[in-house]
Amino acid sequence: MKKIDIKILDPRVGNEFPLPTYATEGSAGLDLRACLSEAVDLLPGQTTLLPTGLAIHIGDSSLAAVILPRSGLGHKHGVVLGNLVGLIDSDYQGQLMVSVWNRGQQPFTIEPGERIAQMVFVPVIQAEFNLVEDFDLSERGTGGFGHSGRQ
């Protein structure tokens, strides 16, 4: 298991609110919690930025983290990430913030300490571009959106 540096910015994290952990041995994501002083009402169509009370420094350019929605919040309540996916670069050292968007029809209340998103670590390959005049032909070529039809 890879070690990643985190800093607790809110003393409730690790006490009132658990540190992010993997729920099972096969879990890919760590739950992030809303580090709030009081409940936040998220009206339909509204977005807001929620603190997690944690700062992170991955420190390894071959890794990044992505913040993803929790499936139950989106499916049952229409609450998803405001930016759809959050990307945490390896050299970022600030607080993890989660943008949430209520795309549902009903107000949704986010309680202090509630699990609001999940964080997954992913490998990164930094590419260097090789300028060419033409590409070697492939079977697909320039076929884009919908080029293979409905199967």
From Swiss-Prot:
Top-level taxon in the UniProt lineage: Bacteria
InterPro entries assigned:
dUTPase (IPR008181), dUTPase-like (IPR029054), dUTPase-like_sf (IPR036157), dUTPase_trimeric (IPR033704)
Q: Does the keyword Ligase apply?
A: no
The alphabetized UniProt keywords are: Hydrolase, Magnesium, Metal-binding, Nucleotide metabolism
Indicate the enzyme's highest-level EC class: hydrolase
Q: Which Pfam families does UniProt cross-reference here?
A: dUTPase (PF00692)
UniProt EC number: 3.6.1.23
Question: What reaction is this protein's catalytic activity?
Answer: dUTP + H2O = dUMP + diphosphate + H(+)
User: Which GO terms are recorded in the biological process aspect for this UniProt protein?
Assistant: dUMP biosynthetic process; dUTP catabolic process
- Tell me which residues bind substrate: R70, S71, G72, N83, L87, I88, D89, M97
Pathway connected to this protein:
Pyrimidine metabolism; dUMP biosynthesis; dUMP from dCTP (dUTP route): step 2/2
Molecular functions per Gene Ontology? dUTP diphosphatase activity; magnesium ion binding
Q: Which PANTHER family match?
A: DEOXYURIDINE 5'-TRIPHOSPHATE NUCLEOTIDOHYDROLASE (PTHR11241:SF0)
Q: Which family does it belong to?
A: Belongs to the dUTPase family.
This chain's function reads: This enzyme is involved in nucleotide metabolism: it produces dUMP, the immediate precursor of thymidine nucleotides and it decreases the intracellular concentration of dUTP so that uracil cannot be incorporated into DNA.
Name the record gives this protein: Deoxyuridine 5'-triphosphate nucleotidohydrolase
What organism is recorded for this protein?
A: Yersinia enterocolitica serotype O:8 / biotype 1B (strain NCTC 13174 / 8081)
